A protein has these predicted regions:
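Short amphipathic alpha-helix that is part of the acyltransferase structural core
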Residues: 2-52, 56-60
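A short beta-turn/loop motif at secondary-structure boundaries
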Residues: 42-47, 71, 139-140
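A conserved beta-turn-beta hairpin within the catalytic core of GNAT-like acetyltransferases
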Residues: 70-79, 89, 108-112, 142-144
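Conserved acetyl-CoA-binding loop-helix of GNAT-fold acetyltransferases
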Residues: 84, 90-103
Length: 150
């Protein structure tokens, strides 16, 4: 997709505007849209090895993923807080975000499996990228999830 500008930054590299935008997108999706009242901010965001992958169209943040190093959430690197702004969904941006996330993780932590906690209804979506289900369904913040590995 043309006209997208990608950045992959550590927390310390984000300016105030970028930080506000990505936190707003996460809150809008994970707390407001999904009606899931949980602490969105955690210390994982500020860890030196954590990366914040963002996609901008013009000057607007439209997609975001948080890339976590091995040992922070799982023994393997992981992708989380995967978010696409509602006005640009179903245009292939989520697929581009996943492809870019996988590329960045491969650069940062080569030769590692990648583990995610996926909402159960999105299992087939993640299977398209090579993830396989490795757990039974469990509830995370009241939403059915499965652990998946690539």
């Amino acid at each position: 997709m043309k006209n997208l500008h990608w950045q992959c930054n550590q927390f310390q590299q984000l300016d105030n505007h970028q930080l506000y935008e990505l936190m707003k997108l996460r809150v809008d999706i994970f707390i407001v849209e999904q009606k899931c009242p949980y602490p969105e901010l955690d210390d994982k965001d500020r860890q030196v090895e954590t990366r914040h992958l963002t996609a901008y169209r013009d000057s607007s943040l439209i997609a975001y993923a948080r890339l976590l190093p091995p040992g922070l959430s799982y023994p393997d690197p992981s992708i989380g807080r995967f978010a696409v702004e509602s006005s640009v969904r179903n245009q292939g941006i989520g697929s581009l975000l996943m492809e870019k996330s996988l590329e960045e993780i491969d650069k940062l932590w080569p030769d590692h499996a990648i583990r995610i906690s996926a909402q159960e209804h999105l299992k087939e979506y993640y299977e398209k990228f090579g993830f396989i289900k490795v757990s039974d369904i469990y509830l995370e913040d009241g939403i059915p999830h499965v652990e998946m590995l690539k």
